[in-house]
Amino acid sequence: MSKFSFNIHHQHKKARNGVITTAHGEIRTPAFMPVGTRGTVKAMLPESVAETGADILLGNTYHLMLQPTAERIARLGGLHKFMNWDKPILTDSGGFQVMSLSKLRKITEEGVSFSSHINGDKYMLTPERSTEIQHLLGSTITMAFDECTPYPATFEEAKTSMQLTTRWANRSRNAFVKRDGYAQFGIIQGSVYEELREQSARDLVELDFEGYAIGGLAVGEGQELMFKVLDYAPDFLPQNKPCYLMGVGKPADIIGAVRRGIDMFDCVIPTRSGRNGQAFTKYGTVNIRNSKYADDNEPLEHDCLCPACKNYSKAYLHLLVRIGEILGAMLMTWHNLTYFQNLMSRIRKYIKLGKDFDFDS
């Protein structure tokens, strides 16, 4: 079994192109991870997701612990077998969903107690339990349990939250079962305060995680402020380990973040937008519901090799989406995921060539 490793093959200014080696295969970086929240990327077969060029996808601890439960997935052979995906899987810690979806949640030093958004049952999620769940799922990359600092937050609020995340990171690291080819990433917090981001990074680097994530961004602060944080935050982290920007997926944000040293991304934007009838193209976004496409016999993009573009017109996609046919959601999602993987491929090529990303997203 391969050991977990990150090799940077090319670098252009702060942008890096490399390969992460794991027990479940290699991840070309910079990488975009489609989100498979409940063990599936919505409207896609797992093999179709692989055909778009994805090397890794993301699963969600919170949702899988509620249904069908981590213990059941473990009994059935683990998440890879359960969902028929043999490439790497990264699971988030569940912390963000607990904070955003659950009512009557209570944060203490021990963890977060909350009621299920499905049936109201009460649960307790701690750093140890989150890490155990991800181990039961068989996650290739496990995330440390953290508190995603809300925005806006005062300096003192952000400091208190960051310090809790640091203590939880210690407990997550102690609970992690180290195995060849598997990894655990720590998450730095600190909101928009450079001093706090630096302290968070310093504390987590001491724990020697296999990789690091920057959390607490894309929560309402806007692109300008996010880029300001990214101008310094990746520099606080080890340059020989992957750097993951959580929950960021707009093409322009990805390009700007790669320029600042980010290696990994995840976001629901391509899948959610696809189901809602919005396609990403190199000419800009297309709202296929618009009546102007009812008689448009051209594909979304002429040089795109996805099934939606190779086989169907905008007029047909317009019809499917307008009448709510499942095929419409499937084809639009397939196209968007292909677009995002093509974007990452182009970025990797430009880094390899030592060129600035002067193409439109």
Swiss-Prot record:
Q: How is the cofactor bound?
A: Binds 1 zinc ion per subunit.
Write down the top EC class of this protein. transferase
GO MF terms listed in the record are:
metal ion binding; tRNA-guanosine(34) queuine transglycosylase activity
Q: What is its EC number?
A: 2.4.2.29
Per the record, its GO cellular-component terms are:
cytoplasm
Cofactor(s), by name: Zn(2+)
Q: What's this chain's function?
A: Catalyzes the base-exchange of a guanine (G) residue with the queuine precursor 7-aminomethyl-7-deazaguanine (PreQ1) at position 34 (anticodon wobble position) in tRNAs with GU(N) anticodons (tRNA-Asp, -Asn, -His and -Tyr). Catalysis occurs through a double-displacement mechanism. The nucleophile active site attacks the C1' of nucleotide 34 to detach the guanine base from the RNA, forming a covalent enzyme-RNA intermediate. The proton acceptor active site deprotonates the incoming PreQ1, allowing a nucleophilic attack on the C1' of the ribose to form the product.
What does the record note on quaternary structure? Homodimer. Within each dimer, one monomer is responsible for RNA recognition and catalysis, while the other monomer binds to the replacement base PreQ1.
Q: Which family does it belong to?
A: Belongs to the queuine tRNA-ribosyltransferase family.
The name on file for this protein is: Queuine tRNA-ribosyltransferase
What are the top taxonomic ranks of the organism?
Bacteria, Pseudomonadati, Pseudomonadota, Alphaproteobacteria, Rickettsiales
Name of the encoding gene: tgt
